[in-house]
């Protein structure tokens, strides 16, 4: 139901086959496995689903004192342990795990909560992994803070650097998975515009209802009384330790059309060098993407465009934030127009996702939506233009002629004479005959 009270749809578990196989392989090897990904991407459901199928111990960490954290973990798993002695600290807890007679799998979800309370825990774990972890046992540490997980496991000076047999990143799911999970017709433009509002985050999909259009979905998720998404950007930034007004202000500027660092700085009334650190932090947190023209290196090119990665967060800053005060006064046609414009940017991303190594290219007043190695000609390029509408044959031919003419005027054309051209439109959203969802 809409108007402030919303039903949360129970979704099918879909499209995590690759992650399931990685978890199976990790269980066979034993050791340490790191699972990370932004909040609400589906890490916990994936891990619980996998452990329901194969068995194991699972506990989600609390944000509380160390004694309470250890007590909660022990309470969650004590029925599966061969002891009833309660641990008084981390050393006791790790010793209990080491004394178990049978191989085990233990997942500690929201691991950064534990290290935030006890910064010595990674060093304790390092010693235990090196000397006390029994053969055939698997410890899974999962977390939502991309920056903190990077600092804990990928920084060369971190105690746990190099200790994991695998780092498994759980990413957003794609359009096909969205259609499967929500039981929607994939070729329809209306379905893709719903996807553009929620992106690949399964938690947001729970607000999708059959028979409701993209405007209904946007109002339920963003514009109704106390909407679910109202504080979402702040929650994500808080997870990443990005406090203060500057990260939000940067995202506001990008959402409203500032794509270059100089443009963002101008919107914020500051100099570009003052934003270098926060721009890098937002990239590290997988909130912003930094795009270079196709074929150029980050070490030599100064031409950069920034974009908000997640479609739902992009919608927040490009549609919700600028229009929330007046949204209720807009006629349905204007609301649909705003959503359509946002969906066009997501469709452009979707087109590039069809080709490995695809990117954008731009110079002066020329821009191409897609440039990549041509899968049909290893020595050539595929150059594409995306249009978020169903083009007629005449419209398609007109866009194709304009694309070829634009290519002939760009510097990249002289270095790549073998180019093939393609125009993408809404007709390209087709059902891929996917496998049935896991019940």
Regions found by a protein language model. Give the residues of each.
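Conserved P-loop NTPase "ATPase switch" module shared by AAA+ and STAND
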Residues: 100-121, 125, 145
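Interdomain motor-coupling "hinge/lid" segment immediately C-terminal to the ATP-binding subdomain
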Residues: 149-247
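Conserved lysine of the Walker
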Residues: 43
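Sensor-1/coupling segment of RecA-like P-loop NTPase cores
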Residues: 33-34, 117, 128-157
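N-terminal pre-P-loop "Q-motif" helix
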Residues: 11-23
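Conserved NTP-binding/hydrolysis module of P-loop NTPases
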Residues: 55-59, 64-85, 98
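Accessory nucleic acid-recognition modules appended to NTPase machines
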Residues: 204, 210, 217-368
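Conserved catalytic cores of phosphodiester-cleaving nucleases, focusing on short active-site segments
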Residues: 355, 368-390, 403
